[in-house]
A protein has these predicted regions:
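Phosphate- and divalent-cation-binding pockets in alpha/beta enzyme and binding domains
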Residues: 22, 47, 81-82, 106, ...
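Internal alpha-helical scaffold of NAD(P)-dependent oxidoreductase catalytic cores
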Residues: 9, 44, 48-51, 128-215
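NAD(P)+-binding Rossmann beta1-loop-alpha1 motif at the extreme N-terminus of oxidoreductases
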Residues: 2-57
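Short phosphate-binding/catalytic loops that engage adenosine nucleotides
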Residues: 32-33, 112, 158, 198
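Rossmann-like NAD(P)(H) cofactor-binding subdomain of soluble oxidoreductases
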Residues: 42, 52-128
Length: 219
């Protein structure tokens, strides 16, 4: 990338789900060049591609071989199953996945340059988040690409860290406790309140204050 800015990199997205949508939009807003979006769902591929001014495809064999960076954001099982097809003919580009629970070495033996870019946040397509405050954790099989991924992540977020696969696995587990388990408690609370004809909205000030406290006090 000597003599060129990182925004000049051509980026292809494999996946157009919640995380991919938010990450692609964030990169696009910062001036990065998204050249293609792949999703097996035509509507998802088209919607994201139009937003970031990219081409789209629903066929793995039609994924461009010209991108410099491929960002894979698929469900874990689909990623593992499709990995050989995804990288075929594009083994010399830089490949990263965005999963918290999948180790970096899943790429080993498939591609030359690889890593992880893990934004630790809960995402939905309908709700855009402030990437500037999202912790992003990076890892790569080369120091040069670690720095490249840090530079890319730093264009989006003020909070960029290098983390090993083992550390990231623990981060992901902690995130599940913090987010998924909490949301399940909300569901149970909502069901209980509904049973007795009470509104869940009554819980919102309590939820908000509990969340605010953790910013100032130890859990």
């Amino acid at each position: 990338m000597a003599g060129r800015s990182i925004e000049d990199m051509s980026i292809a997205f494999i996946g157009a789900g919640n995380l991919a949508t938010n990450l692609a939009k964030a990169l696009y807003r910062k001036g990065f060049r998204i050249v293609q979006v792949y999703s097996r769902t035509k509507e998802s591929a088209q919607e994201l591609a139009q937003t970031v001014e990219a081409a789209c495809t629903t066929e793995l064999q039609a994924v461009t071989k010209e991108a410099q960076l491929y960002i894979v954001s698929l469900k874990d099982a689909a990623f593992v199953e499709l990995l050989p097809q995804i990288v075929s003919g594009k083994e010399n580009a830089l490949w990263v996945h965005t999963a918290g629970s999948i180790p970096m070495n899943i790429w080993q033996g498939h591609v030359v340059r690889y890593g992880v870019l893990y934004p630790m946040q809960t995402f939905s397509k309908q709700r855009e988040v402030d990437f500037g405050q999202i912790p992003c954790f990076v890892e790569s099989n080369s120091e040069e690409d670690v720095q490249l991924l840090k530079d890319i992540a730093s264009a989006l977020s003020e909070k960029v860290y290098e983390a090993s696969s083992e550390q990231r696995k623990s981060l992901h587990l902690a995130a599940v406790f913090t987010c998924n388990f909490t949301n399940h408690m909300y569901v149970l609370a909502a069901e209980l309140l509904k049973k007795y004809g009470l509104p869940f909205e009554a819980m919102l000030p309590l939820i908000d204050e509990t969340a605010r406290k953790v910013h100032e006090l130890e859990p």
